[in-house]
Amino acid sequence: MVDHKRIPKQVIVGVSGGIAAYKACTVVRQLTEASHRVRVIPTESALRFVGAATFEALSGEPVCTDVFADVPAVPHVHLGQQADLVVVAPATADLLARAAAGRADDLLTATLLTARCPVLFAPAMHTEMWLHPATVDNVATLRRRGAVVLEPATGRLTGADSGAGRLPEAEEITTLAQLLLERHDALPYDLAGRKLLVTAGGTREPIDPVRFIGNRSSGKQGYAVARVAAQRGADVTLIAGHTAGLVDPAGVEVVHVSSAQQLADAVSKHAPTADVLVMAAAVADFRPAQVATAKIKKGVEGPPTIELLRNDDVLAGVVRARAHGQLPNMRAIVGFAAETGDANGDVLFHARAKLRRKGCDLLVVNAVGEGRAFEVDSNDGWLLASDGTESALQHGSKTLMASRIVDAIVTFLAGCSS
């Protein structure tokens, strides 16, 4: 039986002429290492920053530069027709303008017109150019036509400038590229005007200056939800506990915390303005009653006894606050449950009980175990709703899982509005 998910995809990487063109090399390398066939189409100005030989060495494929290089092959038609995905990184203000206008004055823009696959633009330009009304209109036009235009990162630009307009990290671009290949369609821009509050990662409760109580959460699933929601138009705030060295998603406000109390305080601060809470963080249930100011020594009397106190349930607290009218904007509350079966019942038995106990609108359920849920890049599980409906979340990347979760949130919000 053929595993279609493992069949290499045809990916075109378009590179336009900006200083960030050198970062396209990492995008090409990562997509190639993911076993995709990558064809690079640089603009003439892009080749002034990075030579064709570099792209050919990284992709293992000849670089395509000229509509007339192989006239019988009609490259400006066939490249777009055969592609499973087109990624343009970096996409300059000029490239976005030409794409929005439907220009076909070079091989890259001509290929964009013939492509029938998802198209992903990763913009890079100075802040003033990104915020200019012309660029804003061009981006809106491309999104309206179904293209995915990433929000640029904020940081150091060329020269001494700093601000919004920096090319998103290569990992960000390739992660979303892989999602588009898994979804087989573009990401809808359907969360514009919505504010999402997402928590991710694990908390740490200090025992002494060296030791802490923690858990195995990597934060990958929560980060993926924040990333996907932002690229679907949401205004996202991500409250991040300890993670596996993850790159902060572009276009997302990230608040870093350590302990359960810090996370609870951050949620209390940001929840009043949020439409949706996605509680993906693994929050410690207990904390030491006292934190030692010096490292606890082994001693000769045996291991020390540590008295524990129960932490407040952050998710249940938000549900109560909404019920008491304290969160009038909150339309959807999404919880997460990492469960194992036991003598009393299976994973879903415990998950259904948790949904009733917590009172959230949606509950994402993962069965945990060796090589499952924690510290891995893929996931599966179930999605339970407060109305009793249940659906399976088929195995896939955590980014694909995030996309399905966001799909469910959009559907739930539509039901609230009807």
Curated annotation (Swiss-Prot):
GO CC aspect terms: phosphopantothenoylcysteine decarboxylase complex; plasma membrane
Ways its activity is controlled: Inhibited by coenzyme A (CoA) and CoA thioesthers. Two related chemical scaffolds that potently inhibit the activity of the CoaB moiety of CoaBC through a cryptic allosteric site that sits in the dimer interface region of the CoaB enzyme were identified.
Pathway: Cofactor biosynthesis; coenzyme A biosynthesis; CoA from (R)-pantothenate: step 2/5; Cofactor biosynthesis; coenzyme A biosynthesis; CoA from (R)-pantothenate: step 3/5
GO molecular function: FMN binding; metal ion binding; phosphopantothenate--cysteine ligase activity; phosphopantothenoylcysteine decarboxylase activity
Binding, CTP: D285, K295, F336, K354, K358
Disruption phenotype: Transcriptional silencing of this gene leads to growth attenuation and results in a bactericidal phenotype in vitro and in vivo, whether initiated at infection or during either the acute or chronic stages of infection.
Cofactor, free-text remark: Binds 1 FMN per subunit.
Matches recorded under InterPro entries: CoaB-like_sf, CoaBC, DNA/pantothenate-metab_flavo_C, Flavin_trans-like, Flavoprotein
Protein name: Coenzyme A biosynthesis bifunctional protein CoaBC
Organism: Mycobacterium tuberculosis (strain ATCC 25618 / H37Rv)
Gene: coaBC
